[in-house]
Structures are given as structure tokens and as C-alpha cells.
Curated annotation (Swiss-Prot):
Gene3D superfamilies: Ribosomal protein L10e/L16 (3.90.1170.10). Residues 1-13 have a biased composition (Basic residues). The lineage of its organism: Bacteria, Pseudomonadati, Pseudomonadota, Betaproteobacteria, Burkholderiales. One of its GO terms (cellular component) is cytosolic large ribosomal subunit. Part of the 50S ribosomal subunit. Pfam families: Ribosomal_L16 (PF00252). This is Large ribosomal subunit protein uL16. GO terms for molecular function: rRNA binding; structural constituent of ribosome; tRNA binding. GO terms for biological process: translation. It comes from Variovorax paradoxus (strain S110). The keyword rRNA-binding applies. The keyword Cell membrane does not apply.
Amino acid sequence: MLQPARRKFRKEQKGRNTGVATRGNSVAFGDFGLKCTDRGRLTARQIEAARRAISRHVKRGGRIWIRVFPDKPISTKPAEVRMGNGKGNPEYYVAEIQPGKIVFEIVGVPEELAREAFRLAAAKLPLRTTFVARQLGA
């Protein structure tokens, strides 16, 4: 699963996920992409599950790019522990997603196969997504 090799600080503040994606909002590497239209978080497990769904559907064909990386640690406290006594330990990593962000790209497969692969992947993700194709001249 994806996670940073090392971080300067183990824990991070919650922050706010605002605005729309100004970077990573167009198909750059492949011919087709899966674009998020919702705001939210994708965990490393969700990204990996979606990647497996795409890989299994296209079999050996095509090349897949993951355009997001889960670099934000989310900490939780154990069950039935009283409040206070500091912040909990990092449990998993998430990628913050703004509307318009391309999550996956694929090349080397027909459009119908790519569309079906992304439909299967979208079922693994908690956000609404749409299928996009590379714009000519872009």
C-alpha cells in the first residue's frame, strides 16, 4: 500500500479541504482518466482496491498511473479510552481530494474497456467520479 517512506513529523493537524483542484485536473499521461467530482479523502486501502480492480479488468493490457498519493496521516485513539492524554497514534494515510482531481489514468486499451475498468474502480471509492478522455491538443 502507498504511504510516505518517512515524514518530518509523525502527526498532522486535521485542516480543511477547500477549493477545487487547480493542479492534476486534466489527463496528462494516459488517454483516459477517472476524475473525482466530490470533495473528500481517499485512504491508501481504497486507492489500492481500485487499482486492483482496474488491473484485473484490463488483464495484461495497458499502463495505469495513480495520480494521487496518500501523504496525510490520520490518527485515532483506541476504543474505550478517556478523552485527553494527548493525540492518538497515526493509523492510516489519506489523500485529500478536491473536485476535479484526476485519480487514475490509463493508456493502451480501448475506450470501452477503460470505461468498464474505471466503473469497477469507482465502486471501490467513496467519492463520485466521472470518466474523462484526453483532449486533443492538450
